Amino acid sequence: MVLSKVACFITFSSLAAAGTLYSANFASDFGPFSTCNVKAPSSATVESGELKFFFDETNFDGTRDDKGVEICVFESGTRTNVKQMAKEGWQGFNIYVPSDTFPTDKHTIFSQQFCPGGCSSWCGTLEIAGNSVVAEHRAACGDPTSATIVQSISRNVWHKVVVRMKVSQSGAGAYEVWWDGSLVYSKKNIDVGFGDWSSDTLSSGWYFKNGQYAYGMCLCKVSAGLEDH
């Protein structure tokens, strides 16, 4: 693992997560989202309708909170994530990746679907790998199904992203991604998700996260953001 300083800008806009619908246009604040898994000087800031993420890896301490900066929806008065869905959910946002402050040779997750239950808990992710976008999903604590869904990201422009995940342990699940209005990945009639099941529904729930999870460390600066269009 190479440790360094990472400053990246990714920009998101019109962020919505449903089950229960949570959305924000970032006109003045994060609401109803909160920053999570972040340690200063890394930060998320709202500027002119954009949510900008800045990740600085200097003096990395090995903790999860020092691997990026993300946003979550918490239960009132707690730091516990709201379990937004039990079966099917949709996650939509716009993302902007700049050419001057985001690297082309690193790995950064920017969209996550979490199924609380150990082993890092994620059951689906979208990540920037080099200059490609990779989708991953899994039905247990093990190796995921992985596919490159965008070969080369066009930088300095906004991209519209929609993720649909339907959990199942009986072959009735789905994982789909739309990029700029086109369906670029679709897997149906699959197993996806894990946790406590009841009639093929996750009684333990699942939820979304957005931001930067720079699990692949680098010697660079990276920045990112979200905006309402």
Identify the meaning behind each predicted range.
Residues 2-4, 17-159, 165-229:
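Low-complexity, Ser/Thr/Pro/Gly-rich disordered linker/stalk regions
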Residues 5-15:
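Sec-dependent N-terminal signal peptides
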